[in-house]
């Protein structure tokens, strides 16, 4: 298995900076990496974030050069956390194409946006779903998130997230890619196609 992982790593440019990793529910080894991105593309020397991704290498010897990129749902789901179920669902593609899972900015390991909120599951349902209570929680959450080093929430958008995905594509040296999305991920995939029709 180690030899297989090393051989798979050599199929990608050294600039991709991939290393062997384990993902829950994935039988074969995976390769993980990250690309450094400006939080605000208009300020390339400003705050930087790392966009993390995983590659599940194709198992066939004669693989196709165009990987499959999976866009998770939500928005807010970690694509890497879904590696096990997604690799099973996309096994037909994964036999001959690498499968790439990108934790988009704000999700998973890529500048995550998580609020530590009180556990309200013990409250009566009417109180849990009270509109005013929810609005207050959202306002509190926004304040918490804005204090993060990467807390400019205006920079966590679908158009910027797909630009990050294209940076992953470039790091992997893929000239053409295939897109698969689930739920919100279909919208992100369409935005990618709109911005980068050449790939």
Go through the PLM ranges and name each one.
Residues 1-5:
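Bacterial N-terminal signal peptides
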């Amino acid at each position: 298995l180690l030899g297989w992982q090393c051989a798979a790593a050599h199929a990608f440019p050294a600039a991709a900076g991939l290393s062997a990793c384990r993902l829950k529910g994935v039988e074969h080894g995976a390769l993980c990496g990250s690309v450094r991105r400006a939080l605000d593309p208009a300020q390339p020397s400003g705050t930087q974030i790392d966009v993390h991704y995983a590659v599940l290498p194709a198992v066939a010897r004669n693989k196709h050069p165009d990987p499959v990129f999976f866009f998770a749902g939500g928005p807010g789901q970690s694509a890497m956390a879904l590696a096990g179920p997604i690799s099973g669902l996309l096994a037909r593609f994964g036999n001959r194409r690498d499968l790439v899972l990108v934790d988009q900015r704000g999700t998973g390991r890529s500048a995550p946006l998580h609020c530590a909120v009180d556990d309200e599951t013990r409250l009566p349902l009417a109180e849990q779903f009270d509109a005013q209570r929810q609005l207050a929680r959202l306002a509190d959450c926004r304040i918490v998130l804005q204090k993060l080093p990467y807390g400019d929430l205006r920079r966590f958008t679908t158009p910027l997230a797909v630009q990050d995905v294209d940076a992953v594509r470039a790091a992997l040296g893929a000239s053409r890619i295939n897109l698969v999305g689930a739920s919100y991920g279909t919208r992100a995939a369409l935005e990618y196609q709109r911005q980068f029709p050449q790939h």
